[in-house]
């Protein structure tokens, strides 16, 4: 959590190897075991802030396509469909499973909350132990946002680690988080439970009022106000320095120092070797190129047959292209040579 420009998305992208253009120091590790981008991709899922779907597909058809191209090839088709059913029930998508996803301004489809849950469902299919979510409540009203976070909370209670950036959560949503990381100017202002955050800021003489949303209060407290930049930055430095000297900050520093020799821990771990030597060397693609081709062909056919006008337009386009090709090349023999540049341009004008 943090105000705009605090570094939330930058940190999330750094953790997931998505900002290779910037200089990053340090090491990424899971349970004390160092990982690379390929290993992390096989262990985690990333839910983008913007939802990208084929609007003519139904919710079920979209999930079936995802199961065909993203699940392990050793899993039979019947088991994949069972997993699709489980995910539909888990993400409460049963009522809209046969509804088209829709395209804003063009095709009426499912609601914003259902679309966001469908994004989670697409990633949960492979049952990843870690999930990264970039602004999962963006563009949703408070009720829909609470429903989305409730889904994330239920997944966390089943053993998954959910890491997300969030902007201006309601007090109900804020209370659902197990841990919060407050950021300001790229620094850690606080890391711990919501109750510990209240006690920490109370110790600084900035106790959150009883009738105030804690999330809004902390974000405003750490924001950089225009025309008051210098004073705000001094205040932010004071809060961040105070956290480093606090009990939680000292514990965090100790954990970091104990995890310094990550390579040694990996050698002592029986499953760390598997992560580094096995998973890291696997292909990033679950399905073969032929399986991907079949799945994409099936998806394209579903999309086209649901739009009769599109079929007519593409048929007309094909006929026009065929006639143009016939007109350009039909009068020449295969053995003829091109004698001039103008003739070459004339023959190839269809491709311009």
Task: Name these PLM-found stretches.
Residues 142-144:
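Helix N-cap at the start of a conserved alpha-helix in ABC-type nucleotide-binding domains
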Residues 1-4, 27-30, 47-48, 65-91, ...:
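Topological signature of polytopic alpha-helical transporters
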Residues 6, 36-38, 50-61, 74-75:
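Conserved catalytic motifs of ABC-family nucleotide-binding domains
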Residues 131-135:
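Catalytic Walker B motif of ABC-type/P-loop ATPase nucleotide-binding domains
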Residues 120-121, 148:
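Hydrophobic anchor residue at the start of the ABC signature
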Residues 17, 24-42, 102-103:
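Conserved ABC transporter NBD signature motif
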Residues 9-21, 122:
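Short, conserved post-Walker A segment of ABC-type ATPase nucleotide-binding domains
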Residues 124-129:
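A short, proline-enriched helix->beta-strand linker immediately N-terminal to the Walker B motif
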């Amino acid at each position: 959590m943090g105000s705009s420009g605090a570094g939330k998305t930058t940190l999330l992208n750094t953790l997931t190897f998505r900002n290779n253009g910037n200089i990053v120091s340090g090491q990424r590790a899971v349970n004390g075991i160092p990982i690379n981008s390929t290993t992390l991709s096989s262990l985690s899922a990333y839910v983008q802030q913007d939802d990208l779907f084929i609007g003519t597909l139904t919710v079920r058809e979209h999930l079936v396509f995802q199961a065909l191209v993203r699940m392990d090839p050793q899993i039979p088709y019947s088991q994949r469909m069972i997993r699709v059913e489980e995910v539909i029930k888990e993400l409460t998508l049963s009522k809209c499973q046969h509804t088209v996803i829709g395209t804003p301004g063009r095709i009426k489809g499912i609601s914003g909350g259902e679309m966001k849950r469908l994004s989670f469902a697409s990633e949960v299919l492979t049952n990843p132990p870690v999930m990264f979510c970039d602004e999962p409540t963006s563009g949703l009203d408070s009720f829909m946002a609470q429903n989305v976070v409730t889904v994330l909370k239920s997944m966390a209670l089943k053993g998954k680690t959910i890491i997300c950036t969030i902007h201006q959560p309601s007090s109900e949503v804020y209370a659902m988080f197990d841990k919060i990381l407050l950021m300001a100017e790229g620094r850690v202002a606080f890391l711990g439970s919501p109750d510990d955050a209240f006690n920490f800021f109370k110790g600084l003489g900035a106790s959150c009022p009883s009738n105030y949303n804690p999330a809004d209060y902390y974000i405003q407290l750490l924001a950089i106000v225009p025309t008051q930049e210098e004073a705000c930055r001094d205040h932010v430095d004071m809060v961040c320095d105070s956290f480093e000297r606090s009990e939680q900050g000292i514990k965090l520093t100790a954990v970091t120092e104990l995890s310094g020799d990550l390579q040694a821990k990996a050698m002592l771990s029986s499953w760390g070797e598997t992560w580094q030597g096995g998973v890291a060397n696997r292909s990033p693609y679950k399905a073969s190129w032929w399986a991907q081709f079949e799945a994409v062909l099936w998806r394209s056919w579903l999309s086209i047959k649901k739009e009769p006008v599109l079929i007519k337009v593409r048929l007309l386009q094909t006929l026009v292209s065929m006639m143009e090709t016939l007109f350009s090349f039909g009068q020449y023999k295969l053995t003829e040579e091109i004698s001039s540049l103008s003739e070459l341009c004339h023959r190839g004008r269809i491709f311009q």
